[in-house]
Curated annotation (Swiss-Prot):
Residues annotated for Ca(2+) binding in this entry: D342, S345, D348
UniProt keyword annotation of Lyase present: yes
Gene for this chain: PSD2
Alphabetical list of InterPro entries matching this protein: C2_dom, C2_domain_sf, PS_Dcarbxylase, PSD-B, PSD_type2_pro
UniProt-recorded name of the protein: Phosphatidylserine decarboxylase proenzyme 2
EF-hand domain sequence ranges: 458-493
Any one GO cellular component localisation term in the record: endosome membrane
Pyruvic acid (Ser): residues carrying this PTM: S880
Entry keywords, A to Z: Calcium, Decarboxylase, Endosome, Golgi apparatus, Lipid biosynthesis, Lipid metabolism, Lyase, Membrane, Metal-binding, Phospholipid biosynthesis, Phospholipid metabolism, Pyruvate, Repeat, Zymogen
Subcellular location: Golgi apparatus membrane; Endosome membrane
GO MF annotation, one: phosphatidylserine decarboxylase activity
Length: 1010
């Protein structure tokens, strides 16, 4: 991100006077100043000796590169007395970086932002606690710096520095970027650390950058380990640029996603109890069975794995996990997989089961909590009687054994709620050729308990427990002094005025000793939490601790106080005495959980880090329908080539590489337009496991490979969500999408190309009118992989404007290239296709060609009326991208797409899915359909997507072969009774529609001993 700005902070240390040195006996002390930014980079000045008037003069300028990802946005200038064998600390001055940058003024003559020289008082840090005196004269200047690389690449143009920066707003763009990338809590901490406390000491950075004091408070056993900091904001300071709390709130602009769908409202607890009736794998010696099972649980972007049990067919786990569920995740499935641990090879898949989270989240009254509840999944069995959380100890361990055989007894007052006990009938892995006897004899059943709670209920239980522990006299009430002591023990900085408002709400006067009941205090705290959630304000924090006293997790003070409350509520709601282990997310995807350590090491060394949102050759995306994390299918040599090519900006931008990619793309396009290219179609389908059922034509009707590549689909195969509502925009393509509320956010999180701007995107067609419309527009990036359907459609209803074509290069649109220094969207071949709409204004669709793309073909003309979902054009062979630009004041993207994009995760969507809406229109709500309600073809698609089974065409051929074998022509021939003749569905699924016919073949094969 810093490479997009190339800003450098020049700090000119001029003089220091009236400084008390480290050794009064040495009149000729030598002082040195060190400038440090967020402990990531620092430089020092030369030594300076005093003049007769004890004035130290440096006149030295220190340059430090400004990065938009800072651990702490803080500038520290410390002064040291250099002696013979050691350096003695003299004092320091600190600056809040964001406030300092906003105080700089732009100088048009030097094309830089400058401050006037000012004297600043030196203070001591709290850990030194030495007497500091004197002042230091400092001046700051920020300027864009062009490195040798930048100068080389811009050598062909006569662009001036001011042209490259765009305008004097570049610094404001950087400030906005750093505010976006730096958590709100860290900005508040940096502001606190830049102000000395009442004793004229700076809060300590070295020992604890996020807390200045540790106060031992004992509310009860829940609070005895809390460490927190007291607020250290002074009312006045000798800094000329000192900022108050109000100033801090006014200079901060925290971009948020204004949607309740992103706020987790509930927590789901799952206890993995046991698995029964696992099939015996034969060991290497064939003398006994080999089964060391463990369970992998996948939900959305989270994957958990239990510990493994040695040599057993009925493992008992007794392990618990908890995860948040957002509104947009209610339609996701919860996947359970049982695997057999192998020491040297891949872990073997044994059985798989799926449960809809919406079934587990159904709320019931306390009178009849579960008797009328019937899960829709046929393989999910809910036991008749629900259990209380405290009664679940019969199925779990009674106590938790820790080190040195010490029993830990936990108070279970927070363990309310009912546990539902389920038995999930799992399917044996379809990729293994189980015998009919094995399938009939072994039916694995996973036993687990679930309980879900809403966050507000967990918080109220937490408040009740803490307040009861603080009520030492058992009065059940608190006055203002007791309430103030309680919030101080939590590390809160709530003012007396805020606490007094708790009493005023109930018409009570806190200043005459009137009290509130514990329930009234809880209601007041919940009103405060609700107010902060709605207004998204962070003026005060309710709780601030460093370490959780229950699970021991540290660095909690890096989070917002509401996040700390969530963490404590979850920890407090767990019954630690009844479980062996609490699971934490361990893997990126369920596929990664099956790999051995050396496989993961090889993938990391070859393709890069295997992580969600990582900039590597491992492309992981999230399926919007199911929530599963999928790994994009790509040839190994292509994956390695992209990594080697685009990890180096010099190579990718060289003239040879550009020429090579252009020739390769044109040559490949000509090759796939030839009739001989038809032979490539079957291998392409087989490698990418494509579903060809939706194709409008049969495979033998395509004359060239390109005709198949930009194939049309059958009518109705891509239905439009809320088709008659023109206030909702839909996806223009089957693609992997990322969306952002502005170009600035897109450059911060995703597009890392040097100097990417809308001006460069529009090329010679850039105008003032387009600048006003699109300079700060909402942008959607829809990337099409080679295996996707390559026709693109209109996302809105409107009139097509004048289409402009822009020639360019043929760089790949792979995420690794987009997140490199290369400006792919500003240099690749592209078209500008405007659509004038009533609801959204002027929407701009930009088809961008990429590597191997022969051409971009448009199907619409100027002034043509298009409806949402109408075809606009198609790409010939290769990867490609669609950019869709909306005026941000008239459009909002869907919250789930924004959440993934801000985490640098692409979302897999299809044509017709909702992507956004007008500000007045509510977000389109997707409804869950159970697996059993889907038609058979759709069930096959879902399982193919998850398991990576064979293609549908192969399945059809196998089915036809089966009908021939079992048709009216007589009994099948023995030579035809081979396992290869079975369809993929028969090998991988246990559908009732296929079981009867396929079982005949399986039975005969078993009897024949094949």
């Amino acid at each position: 991100m810093s490479q997009a700005f190339n800003l450098v902070l020049f700090t000119e240390i001029k003089q220091a006077q009236n400084v008390k040195t480290g050794n009064d006996k040495e009149p000729n002390s030598k002082l040195r100043a060190i400038v440090r930014i967020s402990e990531r980079s620092s430089k020092k000045t030369p030594r300076a000796t005093p003049r007769d008037d004890f004035v130290y003069t440096w006149n030295s300028t220190i340059s430090l590169k400004l990065r938009s990802q800072l651990k702490l946005p803080l500038i520290q200038i410390s002064v040291w007395d250099k002696q013979a064998h050691r350096s003695v600390y003299v004092g320091e001055v600190r600056f809040f970086l964001i406030g300092l940058l906003k105080s700089l003024a732009y100088n048009e003559h030097t094309s830089s932002w400058e401050s006037t020289p000012q004297w600043y008082q030196l203070y001591s840090s709290e850990d030194k606690k030495s007497f500091s005196s004197g002042t230091i004269l400092v001046q700051f200047r920020v300027q864009q710096h062009l490195s040798k690389k930048n100068l080389f690449f811009n050598a062909k143009s006569d662009v001036t520095l001011s042209d490259q920066t765009g305008s004097s707003d570049l610094l404001n763009q950087y400030i906005q970027a750093i505010e976006t990338s730096t958590p709100r809590s860290l900005q508040k901490k940096a502001f606190d650390l830049s102000n000395p406390n009442e004793q004229r000491f700076y809060p300590d950075i070295e020992t604890n950058a996020l807390a200045s004091s540790i106060l031992d408070c004992e509310i009860d056993s829940m609070l005895e380990d809390f460490t927190y900091r007291k607020p250290n904001i002074t009312e006045s300071s000798l800094h000329d640029d000192t900022l108050t709390d109000t100033d801090f709130e006014s200079i901060h602009s925290d971009p948020t996603i204004p949607s309740s769908a992103l706020v987790p409202k509930r927590i789901l607890f799952i206890e993995i109890l046991s698995v029964t009736d696992l099939p015996p794998y034969k060991s290497f010696t064939r003398a006994t069975f080999d089964m060391d099972p463990f369970v992998v649980i996948s939900f959305g972007k989270r994957t958990y794995r239990t510990s493994w049990r040695k040599h057993t067919l009925t493992p008992v786990f007794n392990e618990r996990l908890a995860f948040e569920v957002c509104d947009y995740e209610k339609n996701y499935d919860l996947q359970f997989s049982v695997l057999d641990k192998d020491k040297f090879s891949f872990h073997d898949q044994v059985a798989t089961g799926f449960v809809s989270v919406s079934e587990l989240l159904e709320e019931k009254t306390t009178d009849k909590p579960c008797t009328d509840f019937k899960p829709t999944s046929s393989n999910l069995i809910l036991l008749d009687k629900p259990m209380n959380a405290n009664e679940s100890a019969d199925n779990l361990l009674d106590t938790k054994k820790k080190k040195y055989k010490r029993n830990v007894n936990t108070d279970a007052t927070l363990q309310g709620g009912l546990l539902r006990k389920y038995e999930l009938v799992m399917s044996l892995d379809g990729k293994k050729n189980w015998s009919r006897k094995t399938k009939d004899e072994y039916i694995p059943i996973l036993k687990f308990n679930t309980r879900f709670e809403r966050y507000e209920i967990l918080r109220r239980q937490l408040w009740m427990h803490l307040l009861q522990g603080n009520d030492t006299q058992m009065k059940g009430t608190l006055d203002l002094i007791e309430l103030n002591y309680f919030v101080d023990c939590l590390g809160s900085n709530l003012s007396d005025k805020t606490l007094a408002s708790f009493f005023e709400y109930y018409d009570k006067n806190p200043w005459v000793g009137e009290t509130l009941t514990i329930e009234q205090v809880i209601d007041s705290l919940e009103r405060l939490v609700f107010k902060r959630q709605c207004a998204n304000t962070h003026e005060n924090y309710i709780i601030n601790i460093d370490t959780c006293p229950l699970c021991g997790q540290g660095r909690l003070s890096l989070r917002q106080d509401l996040d700390i409350l969530k963490h404590l509520s979850i920890c407090a709601s767990r019954d630690w005495s009844t479980v062996n282990k609490v699971l934490k997310p361990s893997f990126v995807s369920s596929k990664a959980a099956t790999r051995r350590w050396y496989s993961r090491l090889l993938i990391k060394l070859t393709f890069g880090q295997y992580t969600l949102g990582g900039n590597s050759a491992n492309i992981l995306i999230q399926d919007r329908d199911t929530g599963y994390i999928l790994e994009e299918k790509m040839n190994i040599h292509v994956r390695l080539g992209i990594k080697l090519l685009y990890k180096s900006f010099d190579k990718a931008n060289s003239r040879k590489i550009k020429t090579l990619l252009r020739k390769l793309s044109i040559r490949q396009g000509i090759k796939f337009d030839s009739p001989s290219s038809v032979s490539q179609i079957p291998s392409f389908i087989k490698f990418h496991k494509l579903d060809v059922d939706d194709c409008l034509l049969q495979l033998d009707e395509y004359k060239t490979f390109n005709e198949f590549f930009y194939r049309k689909l059958k009518p109705g195969s891509r239905p439009q969500e809320d088709e008659n509502n023109s206030n909702i925009a839909t996806s223009p393509a089957d693609c992997r999408c990322t969306v952002f509320e502005s170009i600035t956010f897109a450059k911060t999180f995703w597009i890392k190309g040097r100097n990417f701007t809308t001006k460069k995107l529009f090329g010679s067609f850039y105008s003032r009118e387009m600048a006003d419309l699109y300079d700060e527009c909402s942008i959607g990036i829809f990337r099409l992989a080679p295996q996707d359907y390559h026709r693109f459609h209109s996302p809105v209803t409107g009139t097509v404007g004048k289409v402009q074509s822009i020639s360019g290069e043929y760089f790949t649109v792979n995420p690794m290239a987009i997140r490199s220094d290369l400006d792919v969207f500003g240099e690749n071949v592209r078209c500008l296709l405007p659509i004038q709409t009533k609801e959204f204004g002027r929407v701009l669709v930009v088809p961008v060609g990429a590597m191997m793309v022969g051409s971009i073909i448009l199907s619409v003309k100027e002034n043509q009326e298009v409806k949402k979902g109408d075809e606009l054009g198609y790409f010939k062979f290769g990867g490609s991208t669609l950019l869709v630009l909306f005026p941000n004041k008239r459009f909002k993207f869907d919250s789930d797409l924004l959440a993934n994009s801000n985490n640098k995760i692409e979302t897999l969507i299809k044509v017709g899915m909702s992507i956004g809406h007008t500000p007045e229109e509510p977000q389109f709500e997707r409804h869950y359909r159970s697996f059993e309600e889907e038609p058979v073809d759709q069930q096959l698609r879902i399982i193919r997507c998850i398991t990576g089974g064979s293609t549908f065409e192969e399945s059809k051929q196998a089915t036809q072969r089966r009908n021939e074998l079992l048709g009216n022509e007589g009994s099948p021939q023995e030579k035809d009774l081979q396992v290869e003749n079975l369809s993929w569905e028969a090998k991988n699924m246990n559908l009732e529609e296929l079981e009867e016919n396929e079982s005949l073949l399986l039975y005969d094969l078993v009897n024949d001993g094949t």
